[in-house]
Amino acid sequence: MPTPFVHLHTHTTYSLLDGATLLDPLIEHVRWLKQPAVAITDHGNLFGTIPFYTKARSAGIKPIIGCEVYMAKGSLLDKKPPEGPRDFYHLILLAQNSLGYQNLIRLVSHGYTEGFYYKPRIDKSLLRSHSSGLIALSGCLDGEIPTLLRQEQFASASVAAQDFLDIFGPDRFYLELQANGLHQQQRVNQGLIHVHRELGIPLVATNDCHYLKRGDADAHDLLLCIQTGTTITDTTRLRFGTDQLYVKSSEEMAEAFRELPQAITHTNLIAEQCTLEIPLHRTQLPRYNVPPPHTLDSFLETLAQQGLSARLAQHSGPLDQPKYERRLRTELLTICSMGFAGYFLIVWDIMKFARSRRIPVGPGRGSAAGSLVAYALGITELDPLAYDLLFERFLNPDRVSLPDIDMDFCMKRRQEVINYVTEKYGRDHVAQIITFGTLGAKAAIRDVGRVLDIPYDEVDTIAKLIPSQPNMTIAQALAEEPKLSALSASRPSVGNLLSVAGS
């Protein structure tokens, strides 16, 4: 039985329009292969970290958190058109522990906030400052050392290797060998082995996985066409030129590196050294500074009572004031006992700023409209008692979860609010939520049809046969729409289109 292998260079769909592997199938496949751990190393981001971490641990697979970062050839602050085809290299970073994870987060964040130029880039100076707790691999053919070897700059490749050795030390930097069927890779492997012998840097085997199984290579090729806006018939398009970048078995990897067994053994050594535990479900809210002698709770109570009095004073017609006061006390007790007084004060402060600048704000939506405290503070404009709205749908002591208050601001002046919050709490405490766009069934058919050079009218006819229902999949559409299934069965080109678009 071969030594278990651990994939340390793996791209998922979070390598946007580059990786074709979904998290659930990846983890299930790794478990089926009886491999004890797996790393994700998506391009320039950590988007998949938390879902990958939780899913892998639930499946009994050790998750290794990493990233394939973009290394600027000079300073990350240099932002000018590159002299060659690109002005960055690739490098694999893996988090050993909590310190390494924090450093990885800092590096990736700096790439976006300071070094973004076509790609989120870092540089060696920044890497040197945040290398603790990280293991580095030399990367794919686009890594600095492999690139120099491809260019036959062997002395420069050794100098670059020594740079990384100085940054990470002899136990945390590895030369990355791959067996992917590419002629260039074979030449680079020989160069890496020479550097290994010259400098004593250990070797490690990876496979730069971009799709799950070998049979997915063609679908991945189409994904690259979608990324680059080209078609399958374009001879100048980006292509990988191999069908070997899949999640291989331990047996396949052992056979590929039978003359260098230490490269396989080192994958397990690295996996053992990666002991990161991510503390999940720990709420860390920004601190709202209240005027003395108030506490968070007492300040919220004071504002809420004053706000309710002002609201009720504007009320016309009969009014059950004791009912409002009881409801306010009940809500305040729940909010304060759950530790969310500061959260309400933060939201109140943001809304107060917007209104003071005459920035149009929404009246409130979602379950927060059921909170009398939110109404009293001016966060919402709906009286929940007038409409019999339940506070418990918003915040329930029997189901502890963070409150969620949606705030809507005028699109043209939204940035003013963001700037205010950033200045008040600090740039390192404010982030915007990302939304990932995905291809629905109809869009996937149209994109794949374009890539396959199928006439638009024909593709449009097929796409229109997909039922217009939320979350409709191509497999579901084939089962529900007889015309679509008949067309797929009678015309191989349509069947291929649907098969690829649904993969």
Predicted regions located by residue number:
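Alpha-helical scaffold/interaction cores of sigma-54-like transcription cofactors
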Residues: M1-S503
